Amino acid sequence: SLKGGQHMADTVLNTTVFDGATKLITHYNVVSDNSGSTTKIVDVSTLASNNGKTCKTVRLNKVSFNVSVTAPADAIRMQWDADTDVVFQSLAGEMEYDYSSFGGLKNTEATGFTGDVNVVLPACTAGDTGTIVCEWIKVYES
């Protein structure tokens, strides 16, 4: 039972499907209770290294999603983590984007960037849902 001031949170499933030498696959699913949420879907500090090199950032190579939000303004936002996060993709509806022809969307490396990626679902309507599957290209320190 919920007590005064407490509220449930969005129900989030956030998994790494594959973490290879050059490719990373992530799967994110959310069912909102209307409180909104921010989820780190890529944490570069936890990714497998390659020949002793650490992953510095990722590029969004492909994304497929099914986002059902009541209000269009509540689209899910994908953000490069930085001192001031940079929104690089907004997701609403059901679609696929393939950026592989030019090497993927690259991190803008804004001030204080971490290389991580956040997904933000604004406070929205209870029952709004989203599923996002991403293929990332791992970029290593030189």
Region spans (language model):
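Short, Lys/Arg-enriched N-terminal segments with co-localized hydrophobic residues
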Residues: S1-H7
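C-terminal interaction-tip segments
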Residues: M8-T22, P122-S142
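Solvent-exposed, flexible loop/coil segments flanking beta-strands in beta-rich domains
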Residues: A9-N51
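A short beta-strand element within beta-rich, extracytoplasmic domains
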Residues: T57-V69
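An anionic, turn-rich surface loop/hairpin at beta-sheet edges
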Residues: D85-K106
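Noncatalytic modules at the cell exterior or secretory-pathway interfaces
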Residues: G104-D128
